[in-house]
Amino acid sequence: MSEPSSKELFEFKRTLQELSDKRGRGTELVSVYIPPDRQISDVAKHMREELSQSANIKSKQTKKNVQSAIEVIMQRLKLFPKPPEKGLVMFVGMVPRGGPGTEKMETYVFEPPEPIKTYIYHCNSEFYLEPLREMLEEKETYGLAVLDRKEATIATLKGKRIDILKTLTSGVPGKHKAGGQSQRRFDRLIDLAAHEFLKRIGEHMNEAFLQIDDLKGIILGGPGHTKEEFLNGDYLHHELKKKVITTVDTSYTGEFGIREVIDKSMDVLSEIDVMREKKLVQRFLRELINEDGLASYGEREVRQHLQMGAVEVLLLSEDLKYQRGTYECASCGHRMEKTGRDLPDTETCPSCNDQMRLSDRRDMIDDLVEMAEEVGTEVEIISTETEEGMQLLRAFGGIGAILRYRP
């Protein structure tokens, strides 16, 4: 089950914002969360029961609207022999567009970015969105290890969930009090035992972490200098070494040590995605200032480079609030594309001066993402939470490209 891309998360956030703005006149907006292992027939049976129960609603209008929403859900359920891989969410209800009598039935049915865990039926004046909001919390997987010469604990952190994978003990003896040659020989044995223990830790970490495709980083912790000795030695696979974010001094090993590592690393963990975005925009800026740099910006130039397949990474600001429209002239057949914040329904035809009508209107981010996907270009939606993200929006119109080659 793959992790959602930045583009998919952006679209999910946009849908969530749209849903959060909806309000019903009464408690008549219906939300249904269906886990992937739930039988559709069970859900349909429950909907029939709710339809029967809704006959007890006192308000005639609310009763009618709730029953209409449930009937729409029952019809939509017939399209699914079983829930999708991550489950199914359904939001249905009469949403007013203005004063009384302007209500329209609105229906949203989609697979969420993460699996649904619990079946929910909810009817209120707002759609129930809390489970979806929780999906926007950070869910990347991080590798954690706390170690000293006596003990090591290996774990993963995903969102708020900690999984202890392995606890190891060394059997390395403590300091020997004898002096002279006996002391030196004993110290060598201690160092050899410690070396073998660090090798064992590395083997278990390699086995645990190399198989995690979406591993975002590794944090090492523990009392003393054993963690630095481990990191600087030849114990950890070279690909995992690259993912070590930081080392943290802790008072404990074991599970207490793991929790201490997390507590002391919250600032670092929260900055990981932000740093990735910052580095992408900084790379774009470096390319831009070079005479032969592989970068372009602005809608027209980036569109041209996308059409040529020359764009490696497309950078789009999440605050890019423009529409892309297609106008058609019924008289001469001329077609025209136009970008704007609020496109008019008609334009004057440049070919025959007759009136052109807006035949298609779409979000500009969706339009550019579609172009990028057709030519295999990676898309990154950049937030405005960093100085670099604001610079992309304000200085470059929110559209930048890192190129594969200079056309």
UniProtKB/Swiss-Prot annotation:
UniProt keywords, alphabetically: Cytoplasm, Protein biosynthesis
UniProt cross-references to InterPro entries, sorted A to Z: eFR1_2_sf, eRF1_1_Pelota, eRF1_1_sf, eRF1_2, eRF1_3, Peptide_chain-rel_aRF1, Peptide_chain-rel_eRF1/aRF1, Ribosomal_eL30-like_sf
Localization per Swiss-Prot or TrEMBL: Cytoplasm
Native organism taxonomy: Archaea, Methanobacteriati, Methanobacteriota, Methanomada group, Methanobacteria
Name of one Pfam family that matches: eRF1_1
Name this polypeptide is given: Peptide chain release factor subunit 1
GO cellular component: cytoplasm
Native source species: Methanothermobacter thermautotrophicus (strain ATCC 29096 / DSM 1053 / JCM 10044 / NBRC 100330 / Delta H)
Gene: prf1
Main location: cytoplasm
Gene Ontology MF: a single term: translation release factor activity, codon specific
Known role: Directs the termination of nascent peptide synthesis (translation) in response to the termination codons UAA, UAG and UGA.
Protein family (similarity comment): Belongs to the eukaryotic release factor 1 family.
HAMAP family the UniProt entry points to: Rel_fact_arch_1
Parts of the chain that traverse the membrane: none
